[in-house]
Amino acid sequence: MKATLLVSALCALTGCSHQTQSVHLTPLPLSDITDVNAHWSPLGRNESRYPKEAILAEKMGCTSLEYVINAAGRAEQIRVLTPSEDAFSEAAMEALQQWQWQATAANSGHLPVKSQTRFEFCIEHNGQPCDTRGLAQRCPGEDMVRSTGHVYTQV
């Protein structure tokens, strides 16, 4: 019995002393849209849903996400770059997680790239186009996806 306890304790101690070697990944530089398109071709890219609470409050806004397109053609390491309504950031992240890319012939090694996308949320009132001029200045990113909400009021 003592031998079993001693062996168990010894195994526990040696297991605790084992240290895993940490892997240090070199951060990827941000690629411009031309570079991203040279390496990856979008397969599926849905626009984000307009958050219900934001459209009911007639709020417009934007959010920019930075992410890595990994070797499998999926977004990972997603990070919100701009402070915005949480609902806009959440909707953008949900959409981005569904996107998929295919490596181009120039990227036969499926090398990952870092990219960013600006998600704009604008409201059209009674069919009038929304004004998005300020959104591009508030949220960075050459790549842009717009979600449009529609509000109709009776006159």
For the regions a protein language model found, what residue spans apply to each?
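Sec-dependent bacterial lipoprotein signal peptides
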Residues: 1-16
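Charge-biased low-complexity segments
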Residues: 16-155
